[in-house]
Regions:
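Alpha-helix C-capping/helix-to-loop hinge sites
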Residues: 10-13, 34, 62, 85
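A solvent-exposed, acidic/Ser-Thr-rich amphipathic alpha-helical stretch
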Residues: 2-5, 20-75
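Terminal "cap-and-tail" regions of soluble proteins that handle hydrophobic small molecules
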Residues: 1-16, 25, 29, 46, ...
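Short coil/turn residues that cap or connect secondary-structure elements
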Residues: 15-18, 89
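A beta-strand edge to alpha-helix "cap/lid" segment located at domain peripheries
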Residues: 49-122
Length: 122
C-alpha cells in the first residue's frame, strides 16, 4: 500500500514532465497499462517506457497538470490529470482523464485510464 508521500512523489515526477522516468521509477517490472478498458498494454515496465517515449517523440510539448488531489484507498489510487499536447503535426488538444492504479507496495502494478476519446478527436 503506497503512502501519501509516495503517491505525491510519483505525481511530482509526472507533473515535471518526466513521464518515462516516472514509469522507470514507480512501476513494477511486470506492470501493464490499459486505455478505456481496451486490451491491456503488456510487456512490462521497459515496454511501457518505450511506448511512452514514442508518444512523447510525436509531440513538441506536453503540459501535465494535476486537476484534483489523489484518492488513496489501500492499494488503489485514483488520480485526475489534464494533459495538453502540442503535436509536431496537427492541432494542440487537451485531455482530462482519471488514472485508476493498483499498487503493490511502493510501485504501480496496473493502471487503467478513463477518458472521453472525443478529446483526442476520436
Amino acid at each position: 500500500m503506497p503512502s501519501r508521500e509516495t503517491v505525491d512523489a510519483f505525481i511530482a515526477q509526472v507533473v515535471s514532465n518526466d513521464h518515462v522516468g516516472a514509469i522507470r521509477d514507480w512501476y513494477h517490472e511486470d506492470a501493464w497499462m490499459q486505455e478505456n478498458q481496451a486490451r491491456p498494454r503488456r510487456g512490462g515496465r521497459s515496454k511501457l517506457m518505450e511506448q511512452e517515449a514514442a508518444t512523447l517523440a510525436r509531440m513538441n510539448d506536453v503540459l501535465t497538470e494535476l486537476v484534483a488531489p489523489p484518492i488513496i484507498d489501500g492499494d488503489h489510487v485514483a488520480i485526475r490529470w489534464r494533459f495538453t499536447f502540442t503535436p509536431k503535426q496537427g492541432q494542440r488538444f487537451a485531455m482530462e482523464e482519471v488514472a485508476w492504479q493498483t499498487w503493490r507496495g511502493d510501485k504501480i502494478a496496473t493502471e487503467t485510464f478513463f477518458y472521453d476519446p472525443k478529446q483526442r478527436g476520436g
